[in-house]
A protein has these predicted regions:
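Boundary/entry segment of secreted carbohydrate-active catalytic domains
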Residues: 17-62, 67
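Hydrophobic faces of well-ordered beta-strands that scaffold small-molecule active sites
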Residues: 32-36, 64-66, 99-103, 149-153, ...
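Glycoside hydrolase catalytic-domain groove-lining segments
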Residues: 186-266, 316-322
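Active-site groove signature of glycoside hydrolases
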Residues: 106-110, 131-166, 299-300
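Substrate-binding cleft of secreted/luminal carbohydrate-active enzymes
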Residues: 149, 250-326
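N-terminal Sec-pathway targeting helices
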Residues: 1-16
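Short, acidic/polar
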Residues: 42-58, 130-141, 193-202, 279-289
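Aromatic-lined substrate-binding rim segments of carbohydrate-active enzymes
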Residues: 49-120, 163-190, 204
Length: 327
C-alpha cells in the first residue's frame, strides 16, 4: 500500500503542479470579440437588429461570433430563411469586423440543440442526413465571404449538456469532413468545455480549439447552489500549451462569462438574483482572470444582456466597461 502511494504521488503530483501551480505570461496583444444571438436578444424583449447595430457601432468589437439556429434557417424542410443572417454578416463586413459562423444542430444558447419542428420526429439516421444537407447549404452560401475567419461546427459536441436527442462523435467527424470538402481553406473551430475537458478530442479533429471560461455558475445538484470553479488562470494556459506542443493547434476562448448564470433563464430571473453571478465587480474580476490566463483571443458572452441592462434597466456600467475593453 505504501509503495502504491509513493508511485501515485510520483505520477500525480507533477501533473497537478503543471496544471494548477504558477503564472501564465500575459499577452501584450489581445483581440477581444463578442458572441451574438438574435434569439437571445428577442428573449430579452429587445429589438434584435437595433441591439446588433448598437453593438457593432458603439462597442466596435474587432471580431464577432454569430450564433445561428437550424430551426431559424430551415423552418420548413428545404425552405431556407437566410435574410436575417445575410443582414448580420453584411453589417459586420461593412464595418470590417471579422466573424466566426456557428452552424449545426447544437449551437450556442439554450436549449443548445435547435431542431426544426419538421425534423423532431425523424429517427437518428434521418436527422443526421438532414443536418448534413443543412450544413452543406449554409457552408456553400457563406464560404466566400472575406471576413469569415472560421467555421464553428456544432457547439461543445462532446459535452452532454442541453436538450439534445443524441450525441455521436462518429457523426461529428462526418460533419467536419463535409465542411473540409466544401471549404478546405477556412479553419474549422471545435469547441470544448474549459472546465471539464483537456481539449484533446477537439484538437485532434479541428484546425483550432475554442474553450469556455466560466467563473460563477448555478449547479442544479443537491437542491441547487452557486459555485465558483476553483481553477487558477494558469490552468487554461497550461492546457493550451499541451495542445500546441502535441497537436500544433491554437486555442482561443470563445465564451468568456460576462452575464449571469442562475437557476432559471436570465430573462425571467430577478435582478437581485442576477447580481449573485454577474455584476460590475464580478465582470472586472472575470476580465482580470482572463488576461492572467495568457490567451490572446477572447469572445465575451452576454453582450445582449449588457444592452438589456443598459436600455431596459438603466444600468449601463458593464456596457461602458466592455466598450473601453473592446475598442
Amino acid at each position: 500500500m505504501k509503495r502504491l502511494l509513493i508511485v501515485f504521488s510520483i505520477l500525480i503530483i507533477p501533473i497537478f503542479i503543471f496544471l494548477f501551480v504558477g503564472k501564465a505570461p500575459i499577452s501584450d496583444d489581445i483581440t477581444w470579440g463578442v458572441t451574438f444571438s438574435s434569439n437571445y436578444a428577442i428573449d430579452l424583449g429587445l429589438d434584435w437588429k437595433e441591439a446588433y447595430l448598437e453593438i457593432l457601432d458603439d462597442l466596435s468589437p474587432k471580431r464577432i461570433r454569430i450564433a445561428t439556429q437550424w430551426n431559424d434557417l430551415e423552418p420548413e424542410k428545404r425552405i431556407y430563411h437566410f435574410e436575417d443572417l445575410d443582414w448580420q454578416i453584411e453589417e459586420a463586413e461593412m464595418r470590417q469586423i471579422d466573424f466566426i459562423l456557428t452552424v449545426g444542430m447544437k449551437t450556442p444558447r439554450w436549449p443548445e440543440c435547435h431542431i426544426p419542428y419538421w425534423a423532431n420526429d425523424l429517427n437518428k439516421e434521418e436527422q443526421q442526413e438532414e443536418v448534413l444537407t443543412f450544413l452543406e447549404t449554409v457552408i456553400l452560401r457563406y464560404k466566400d465571404h472575406p471576413n469569415l475567419i472560421a467555421w464553428q461546427i456544432e457547439n461543445e459536441p462532446f459535452l452532454d449538456f442541453g436538450v439534445c436527442p443524441w450525441y455521436d462523435k462518429g457523426f461529428f467527424l462526418k460533419e467536419i469532413d463535409l465542411a473540409n470538402t466544401i471549404d478546405p481553406d477556412t479553419p474549422k473551430l471545435v469547441t470544448e468545455s474549459g472546465e471539464l475537458s483537456l481539449w484533446f478530442l477537439g484538437a485532434e479533429i479541428g484546425d483550432m480549439v475554442g474553450t469556455t471560461m466560466y467563473r460563477q455558475t448555478w449547479w442544479h445538484k443537491a437542491g441547487g447552489f452557486y459555485a465558483k470553479y476553483p481553477i487558477p488562470a494558469v490552468h487554461y494556459y497550461r492546457k493550451a500549451l499541451m495542445i500546441r506542443k502535441i497537436f500544433d493547434k491554437d486555442v482561443i476562448v470563445v465564451e468568456l462569462q460576462g452575464e449571469p448564470w442562475g437557476p432559471v433563464p436570465t430573462f425571467i430571473l430577478d435582478l437581485k438574483e442576477q447580481e449573485k453571478s454577474m455584476n460590475s465587480e464580478i465582470f472586472d474580476k472575470n476580465i482580470d482572470y482572463a488576461i492572467r490566463s495568457g490567451f490572446d483571443e477572447f469572445y465575451l458572452w452576454g453582450v445582449e444582456w449588457w444592452y438589456w441592462m443598459k436600455t431596459v434597466n438603466n444600468q449601463p456600467e458593464i456596457w461602458q466597461k466592455a466598450k473601453k475593453l473592446l475598442r
